[in-house]
Regions:
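Select transmembrane alpha-helical segments in multipass membrane proteins
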Residues: 2-11, 75-89, 176-186, 263-281, ...
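Hydrophobic transmembrane alpha-helices that form the core helical bundles
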Residues: 48-59, 63-113, 275-299
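Membrane-water interface regions at transmembrane-helix termini and the short interhelical loops
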Residues: 103-107, 126-148, 205, 326-335
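C-terminal membrane-solvent junction of multi-pass transporters and transport-like membrane proteins
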Residues: 119, 176, 294, 301, ...
Length: 404
């Protein structure tokens, strides 16, 4: 039970990133009602595909990664494609996290050189300190994540306590100024429910216990959905649609949103609470993603090359590439992040649907089977493909632009 609680918080902590705070800017022209329905729909899709991995793991050892699952049903081609996509995606995410973590840490460190030197030092300190928990093992990640998660939630509750008394019912009734904005916002909210790269680590940590993994996924993603709802309720209730649109014109960033809420609540505490939350959200997301990457590399080496690398070696392979990209070639991970939605859709939607399709043909009587037949699998697959094509339609001018 203790591991199940920890796994649940890892699921929620991985999803609830610092980007959550700026999500109301994405939904600024949509209104609360449409935003809530969109969030619930995308939560349902991505929780469904996460549970497909639970079903799949009944046919494999508890310590194998997604690449080995893909190889089990699609041969070495499946392993190569799935592993390559997952590793590139997670490397790009970690590079972004260490870059962001370094920027936050730089303000706290004593001056030891120019700004560029201080940034490099801060990135290294951030990576070494929090990366050490990854190297030690999932148990240590579980422990620190619990502490960080509860402090993060405390900061979040403080922000809500300052905002909720000031919400206006009329603001909550705002309708979309353009229905096409709902479509444009879908990819941003879609990736906000991503934690699928951490599922192999959680399954291994829970010793392949199907019930515990299901609980961790359902409750962890449910906590995330509830947090997203409360934040959207608070911001959409506090700010009118016209005020949102003014923020988009003047400063379409989290700072712009915080400044607007500060003017209404008249509480300087809110800015500090938001900073604490965003910092801890970045760290908990970093922990979940890095743990998933380390386990992915371990699975690749063990299953493909029969190399049983130690945790320190795996840690170096996990963190050196993204740190180098972050410090010396940031354009590289920024380019990769430009295709983050497509890579995420592949391993969070396309891959589990394809694997379960084959697995059910080979293993028709598994003890646990996710609800829904082939029609639902096809529907989810089509939705995933459509959502990932939306950014291209926005760039081509067929859909309106949204922040995110």
């Amino acid at each position: 039970m203790n591991k199940t609680v920890g796994s649940t918080l890892l699921v929620a902590g991985t999803m609830i990133g610092a980007g959550m705070l700026a999500m109301p800017l994405t939904s600024a022209g949509i209104g609360l009602t449409a935003t809530v329905f969109l969030l619930i729909g995308l939560w349902a899709v991505l929780t469904f595909t996460a549970l497909l991995f639970v079903e799949l793991y009944q046919t494999a050892n508890s310590d194998v990664g997604i690449g080995t699952l893909a190889a089990q049903y699609f041969g070495q081609a499946g392993r190569i494609i799935s592993t390559a996509v997952l590793i590139v995606f997670l490397y790009a995410l970690i590079a972004a996290y260490v870059s962001g973590g370094g920027s936050l840490l730089m303000d706290l460190l004593p001056a030891m050189g120019d700004k560029d030197t201080m940034n490099k030092i801060a990135v290294l300190v951030f990576t070494i300190f929090f990366g050490s928990f990854i190297v030690i093992g999932t148990h240590s990640v579980d422990k620190i994540n619990r502490v960080l998660f509860f402090v993060m939630i405390a900061a979040f509750i403080l922000v809500l306590a300052l905002m909720l008394p000031n919400i206006k019912f009329d603001n909550l009734m705002a309708m979309p100024i353009d229905n096409a904005l709902i479509i444009s916002a879908s990819p941003v909210f879609f990736t906000a429910f991503g934690f699928h790269g951490s599922i192999p680590s959680l399954n291994k940590y829970l010793d392949g216990n199907v019930k515990s993994l299901r609980i961790a996924i359902l409750v962890g993603s449910g906590i995330t959905l509830f947090a997203y709802f409360l934040w959207q309720l608070s911001t959409h209730g506090l700010l009118s649609q016209n005020e949102f649109l003014q923020i988009l014109r003047e400063d379409a960033t989290l700072n712009g949103l915080v400044k607007a809420t500060l003017e209404i609540t008249q509480s300087p505490i809110i800015a500090n609470a938001v900073k604490i939350f965003s910092t801890l959200a970045l760290v908990t997301s970093f922990l979940g993603v890095a743990l998933g990457l380390l386990e992915c590399i371990e699975d690749l080496l063990k299953q493909s090359f029969d190399i049983h690398a130690g945790r320190i070696s795996l840690g170096l392979m996990t963190f050196i590439p993204p740190v180098l990209f972050s410090l010396f070639y940031p354009e590289g991970f920024i380019l990769a992040l430009g295709y983050a939605g497509q890579m995420f859709a592949f391993y969070a939607v396309v891959l589990p649907v394809a694997l379960v399709w084959k697995a059910r043909a080979i293993h028709p009587n598994l003890p646990y089977r996710v609800w829904g037949g082939k029609a639902l699998l096809v529907l989810v697959l089509v939705l995933g493909v459509i959502i990932t094509s939306i950014p291209f339609a926005i760039r081509a001018g067929y859909l309106p632009f949204v922040v995110g």
